[in-house]
Amino acid sequence: MSTVIRRSLAARQLWSWNGFCQWITSTENRLYIGWFGVLMIPTLLAAAFCFVIAFIAAPPVDVDGIREPVIGSLIGGNNLISAAVVPTSAAIGLHFYPIWEAASLDEWLYNGGPYQLIVLHFLIGVWCYLGRQWELSYRLGMRPWIAVAFSAPAAAATAVLLVYPIGQGSFSEGLPLGIAGTFYFMLAFQAEHNILMHPASWLGVAGVFGGALLASLHGSLVISSLIRETSEEESQNAGYRFGQEEVTYNFLAGHYAFLGRLGFPGLGLRNSRSVHFWMAALPTVGIWAAAIGIGIMAFNLNGLNFNQSILDSQGRFIPTYADLLNRANLGIQVMHAPNAHHFPLLLAAQP
């Protein structure tokens, strides 16, 4: 009798586990969960809840570790533009700083513990979302290029939130989680590393702008060459049926005939796959390059930067816009310096 009961319990447990696995990996669900989603959902929820609470009500954070806390919350007097989740204090450095490592909750908040909690959970969730894209593509028999394209923004987020703080030795150097904080990070990064004069930045700008140009160009050509399936009194959009096998626009009329006649005939592509490939490849490679540039700068490898002034054959200085940029960097460095003293050090040391 006991043997029969044990077998029935084992079969029930096996059935429940198999049912759970089938539900997790089922492509018939309204939202695909997947095994990566099992980790993605709780981590992103934790990051989102902590971000909202910290953005609204976090106390001041001693981000520079010099007992001069910075207020970043809405309750502290900021608006939606200036508010941000302030990075973890420089006094913590790169140490893992969960709540139980602090002596009290007030100390954890004062040292910027929520920033580390948000960033680490968010990055885990982002990379799990990438894995979820690959997993769903695999189960549907699709190729994995959707996940490859998403790896660009995932790499960019990892670069500014994790790689750069690791290279600089402190989470206090990470990107503040806010609108004004983002621009603050950009200015400070430019002042310290002159990223605008680095080839990786040029590739990033070219890729993002090139992808935006192709997207607007292709979208406008598609809208302009829709195949009418309705009368003149009805909208052309009403002629589309979800899942229809017929094409909705004339690709050759838009790209080859129209675009080819506006410029060089070679600009008019005849293959829609080539257009969509470049629309995906340009921004993806560009953002990859930008993320690589931030990773290089994180460890102060500035050898590819154009920081030197141009001299003629007689050694005389030739002013360029690069020199203006270098001077601007020096000014931003002075403004960015924490607790800056504008007196000479020897004079300040006099009794």
Curated annotation (Swiss-Prot):
The record marks 193 as: Stabilizes free radical intermediate. Residues 349-351 form a propeptide. [CaMn4O5] cluster binds at residues 173, 192, 336, 348. Tyr-164 forms a radical intermediate that is referred to as redox-active TyrZ, YZ or Y-Z. C-terminally processed by CtpA; processing is essential to allow assembly of the oxygen-evolving complex and thus photosynthetic growth. The record marks 164 as: Tyrosine radical intermediate. Its EC number is 1.10.3.9. This is Photosystem II protein D1 1.
